[in-house]
Amino acid sequence: MSVPQETVNRIARELFEAKRDVHTVPYVSPQLPERDLDAAYAISAEFAALRERELGVKRVGRKVGLTNPLVQQRVGIDEPDYGVIHDDMVHASGTHLPLSRYNRLLIEAEVAFVLKSDILEATREAVEAAIDHVTPAFEVVDFRYDGSVGQIVDTIADNAGCSGVVLGEEQHPYGEVDLTKVEMVITGGGTEITRGVGSNVLEDPVNAVIWLAGTAIRTGEPLRAGEVLLSGSIGYIEPWPADVECVATITGLGRVVATANSKG
């Protein structure tokens, strides 16, 4: 990483305050060498650490994003990224999300994996053995930037856009459902928003977890028992419509429900 630590700390502080106070900041990419992913992840790590130190939140999971070629094409990025899920970011199905807490709320539906043991080896066998159950989930996506997503370093530095997760109503043992063949539909107030199939996510959502496990091991922060892991969007990422009930249904896994409220 060629970026001074004081620059990393300053940018992380700006993103932390933007999230806390709900305002936007300029892209970080002009301040970093082109495609310096190490610097972007260092900023993201300090951003997460600031939340943990100053707000007292705890890490309870991770997300891997940009696993769907539809989403990659939409944002002009060609590789996955990852971020952190803190305990104050986790919601139950049926939750109401105040839009006043977000800059520009976006909606995704995906398969969430919950671990029963640590993952210390990034193999399919080790990952599958560590999974306790799967459930449908919304990722609550929000960025701290003045414009749209920006470059990959902008996305990574901003916790990969992850601002929360809404977990589904049902829990299913891993292997009970063929995740490559599940079909997902999101509706808002009964109107279809997006749809997709499980194979959109790196051909199989568990492949996203394998990728995440390897990345986590390389960075010295392996995935731990109890963590919630978001595997990436099955359909497009779309604006979250206000004041209507949004429902994501994934065949064989059930549904997840949430409403973004313009008041309150």
Predicted regions and their residues:
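Catalytic-core "active-site belt" of small-molecule-metabolizing enzymes
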Residues: 2-204, 241, 245, 255-261
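Short alpha-helix capping/helix-loop boundary micro-motifs
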Residues: 33-34, 214-216, 232-233
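Buried hydrophobic packing segments
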Residues: 47-48, 167, 209-216
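Active-site scaffold segments
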Residues: 112, 209-210, 230-232
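Short strand-turn-strand beta-turns centered on an Asx-Gly dipeptide
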Residues: 187-189, 231, 251
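Structured functional modules or segments
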Residues: 221, 230-232, 236-244
